[in-house]
């Protein structure tokens, strides 16, 4: 074989090797720079990315995936419900490989968009959209809210406990109901008004801090000294009102939701007993990872609770909540995880709930 032919064959082998080195991996990314980056899109509800709660947690999960898998990411904030479908359309048009809709209010928009774009993968949080290209993530909020109720029931001195919800509907009712069941389990006297909804306020908003402040003031005027919220940005207003009351010499406490709000709102850490951790970030991270790994399962619904590690209490709880109370919370948490306690999730179930004492 002559030298020219040997040289040509060698060059071909090298070129082939280099080309193979740039071949795409299963996740759509390429080794060596010839990359088709997976793109992730997300639209919030009107609470916005910086609600220090639900939407921010969703955003955190995708940012973790960005760091680990080097995916592209584009979030869009909705200002009103009218933005939902157009935001989803825009994310599809931008080339997103998976689009997340954050919140039950987007069910109708997601249903319409999933039909329009059958080849695009979608995920929605807090409701079920039964479409072959949509995975639905739901949480057992009542379980974590029950634990917050145990804390509230043990910490109240007035035996009056309040709840502020974003909107009076099935999802947010799960927070209210679980919370009332937890209070009733450790302090039945403090649960009476809560169960009768005498100390329950729905702001009909997830973003108006003024409404949260007004609601908290009204509850404190009724004698409530512990208030739990499931209202997104409205909860910031609740904390503002409680802080002002604390500054005026009143012993009043707030309980946060979705993220550790003593961390996301450090200026109110001194008046927060605990927060119910709802790992929305786990759902958005796992949803993104499923696309990266090629394991996306559309047409499925995933339910996440204490047993799945997606519901918990804030790690900062020990700052303002005594150890004996937190020890009791852990016992209830174990009982729920082991199936010894089934926490009610509807107002009707709450009526027939029989408290279970753990020791």
Please tell me what each predicted stretch does.
Residues 1-9:
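Bacterial N-terminal signal peptides that target proteins for export
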Residues 12-13:
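Repetitive helical segments and hydrophobic/amphipathic motifs
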Residues 23-359:
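A residue-level marker of the well-folded mature domains of exported/periplasmic proteins
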Residues 17-21:
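C-terminal motif of bacterial Sec signal peptides marking the signal peptidase cleavage site
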């Amino acid at each position: 074989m002559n030298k020219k032919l040997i040289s040509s064959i060698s060059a071909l082998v090298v070129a082939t090797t280099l080309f193979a080195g740039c071949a795409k991996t299963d996740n759509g990314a390429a080794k060596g720079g010839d990359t088709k980056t997976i793109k992730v899109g997300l639209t919030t509800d009107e609470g916005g990315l910086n609600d220090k709660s639900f939407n921010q947690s969703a955003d955190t999960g995708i940012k973790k995936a960005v760091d680990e898998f080097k995916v592209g990411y584009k979030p869009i904030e909705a200002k009103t419900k009218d933005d939902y479908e157009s935001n989803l359309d825009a994310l599809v048009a931008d080339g997103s490989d998976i689009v997340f809709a954050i919140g039950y209010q987007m069910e109708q928009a997601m249903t319409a968009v999933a039909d329009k774009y059958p080849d695009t993968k979608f995920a929605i949080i807090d409701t079920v959209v039964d479409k072959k290209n949509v995975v639905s993530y739901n949480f057992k909020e009542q379980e974590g809210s029950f634990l917050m109720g145990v804390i509230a029931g043990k910490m109240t001195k007035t035996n009056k406990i309040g709840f502020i919800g974003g909107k009076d509907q099935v999802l947010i009712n799960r927070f209210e109901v679980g919370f009332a069941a937890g209070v009733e389990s450790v302090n039945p006297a403090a649960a009476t008004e809560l169960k009768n909804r005498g100390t329950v306020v729905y702001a009909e908003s997830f973003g108006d801090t003024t409404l949260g402040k007004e609601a908290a003031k009204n509850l404190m005027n009724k004698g409530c000294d512990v208030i739990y919220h499931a209202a997104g940005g409205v909860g910031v207003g609740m904390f503002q009102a409680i802080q002002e009351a604390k500054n005026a010499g009143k012993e009043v406490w707030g309980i946060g939701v979705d993220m550790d709000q003593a961390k996301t709102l450090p200026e109110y850490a001194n008046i927060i007993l605990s927060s119910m951790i709802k790992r929305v970030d786990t759902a958005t991270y796992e949803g993104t990872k499923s696309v990266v790994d090629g394991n996306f399962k559309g047409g499925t619904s995933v339910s996440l609770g204490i047993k799945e590690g997606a519901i918990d209490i804030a790690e900062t709880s020990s700052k303002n909540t005594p150890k004996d109370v937190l020890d009791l919370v852990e016992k209830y948490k174990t009982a729920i995880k082991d199936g010894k306690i089934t926490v009610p999730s509807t107002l009707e179930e709450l009526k027939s709930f029989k408290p279970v004492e753990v020791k």
